[in-house]
Amino acid sequence: MYKRPRFNRVLLKLSGEVLMGPGQFGIDPATVARVADEIRAAREAGYQLCIVVGGGNIFRGLAATARGIERSSADYMGMLATVMNAIAVQNALENLGVDTRVQSAIPMPTVCEPFIRRRAERHMEKGRVVIFAAGTGNPFFTTDSGAALRAAEMKCDALFKGTSVDGVYDADPKKVKEARRYDCVSFNRVLADDLKVMDASATALCRDNNIPIVVFNIREQGNFSRVLKGDGVSTIVCNEEE
């Protein structure tokens, strides 16, 4: 049976959709402020935090490819969207007094720092929140893969994926009323059953580096801090299974 360890350094993966709140597109300032307050509370509780943000609220590379934009170009456009989201989250955190740095995998020195692993580690050791933008910096990789990569590089204890559902289910809970939520599920089952936690390459990277993935509902007020302490509703994806 899986025994959950004490997490100290964690990476929070936020989808772009979380940042658009009740809207259908773009950034909702009230939602970003609420998410920032969740992050502030976790930081004040003593956790070292880094964040990866998606860009789907602004631009979706795969959807654009289907409409005729060349795949690499579409992916780069999506990476730039994540930088916009990262700056929005940084602004919201700094409004709350949280010292924050944005590092981009695509260098843009007038906007933010380039990604430098050792510098990012020093920021976190000094109590700063680090937001990683532009995914891996390469086309054909999702921001989920970018999150898994950064979690491994930063030696994070876990990757927390904030979504609009409270965990991983054996079927789509929006379509199947009897769908069962897992408290704990193995990486291999997620991959074999295609449970859609993250894309396969991100899941495999976390498995190979023994980084648990914690899936939880970021839209519920105060839930991030509860799940960090082991009190909230979530699913843990790990190398063991209940």
From Swiss-Prot:
Keyword Nucleotide-binding part of the UniProt annotation: yes
Activity regulation: Inhibited by UTP.
Positions bound to ATP: 13-16, 56, 60, 163, 169, 172
Major place of residence: cytoplasm
Record-level GO BP terms: 'de novo' CTP biosynthetic process; UDP biosynthetic process
Reactions catalysed according to its record: UMP + ATP = UDP + ADP
InterPro entries linked to this entry: AceGlu_kinase-like_sf, Asp/Glu/Uridylate_kinase, Uridylate_kinase, Uridylate_kinase_bac
Keywords from the named record: ATP-binding, Cytoplasm, Kinase, Nucleotide-binding, Pyrimidine biosynthesis, Transferase
Residues annotated as binding UMP: 55, 75, 136-143
UniProt function note: Catalyzes the reversible phosphorylation of UMP to UDP.
Official protein name in the record: Uridylate kinase
